[in-house]
Amino acid sequence: MLDIKYIKENPDEVLARLAKKGKDAKEEIAQILALDTERRNLIAETESIKAEQNKMNKQIPVLKKEGKDVAPLFAELKAMGAKTKEIDERLKTVDTQLTSVMLGLPNLPDDDLLPGGKENNEPLRYFGEPKIFDFEPKNHVDLCTDLGLIDYKRGTKLSGAGFWIYRGMGARLEWALLNYFVDTHIGNGYELVLVPHMLGYECGLTAGQFPKFAEDVYWLETAEDERRRFMLPTAETALVSLHRDEILTEADLPRKYISYTPCFRREAGSYRADERGMVRGHQFNKVEMVQYTLPEQSDDAFAELVANAENLVKGLGFHFRTVKLAAEDCSASMARTYDIEINIPSMNGYKEVSSVSNARDYQARRGMMRVRRENGKTEFVHTLNGSGLATSRILPALVEQNQQADGSVVVPEVLRKYIGVDVIKK
């Protein structure tokens, strides 16, 4: 959620920055300003009436002592009470409307981001070189099938399109990747948190995914008197609610968390021909990084998260690039995002395996997550997140980049202690 004080003081700047994200917010900003003015007027009117009520309540005993008729004053007080109740009801309506409009606005992009979408994304750096084969390479679907790593057919039989089964060395390779990610993060000082996979609506609201993207997740059928729950689309949705409605101290920050979870997404729309196999699916495994920081720490925290993700991919020996996203390609909740994109040879391009983002205080305002400074004042923390990493594109890249002419796959050195072999073969 944006800062309403900032909107009121800088409406034109807010409009211009939201326009960089492709959002024409003229109507919403006008609504916010009008509703805020009405809200302040209603509060002032209520306070004026209450002041008059207090004055009259002090007069009544004096008038009674003087033997004067106080019935007119009681009648007036009753009318004032009715008016106050009427104003309070209107104030509740205005507050609800104002909150609804505020929740619908995306985050402001950082000033240095280019406007527009993917066409304006900026590659910042490359690592390694694209793999060149002296034989006809296979794609990851054929490799995983031939080696018995992934069972696509039975995955579809069990759950439909967009699902797969890890088998044998495929399951062990997947588990090796996850262990490598988790162990590296723990070594970097992050706390491992295993969160519920079913979350309440407030988690999606705090993360900024709801209400706009509420239909992109899988909702559970619940009884009318039960709390509504959904399957988490990413551990970020849970981790950024860990400190919802809490006030932390400066000494508490930064808080650094990681969590391994399966992620569940509807992935509406048709799949492109090059996205077959594991590249897009309804369920995949991911390790997520989240930090809570002081505002002045968040730029350094962002650089740290990007480096963490890059180093994981470097450790696997892959060719990849880091891309600074243009404003419109950043998600609604984020002020800036860098993607780490890995090369998958059969797809003739790069696929994102990590998005690292800074939400600034946008999520903290939605979830009332604050820090009490040493001087006693409170302010909103900053929240950041990043994939560290998702496996559903790492594994395809691994088998394609590390394949050999005989159809076997070389296991990256960092994974060998987890999987126990150097080469995966039939």
Where on the chain are the PLM-derived regions?
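N-terminal alpha-helical targeting/anchoring segments
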Residues: 1-131, 145, 149
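TRNA-recognition modules of translation machinery and tRNA-sensing kinases, especially anticodon-binding
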Residues: 126-426
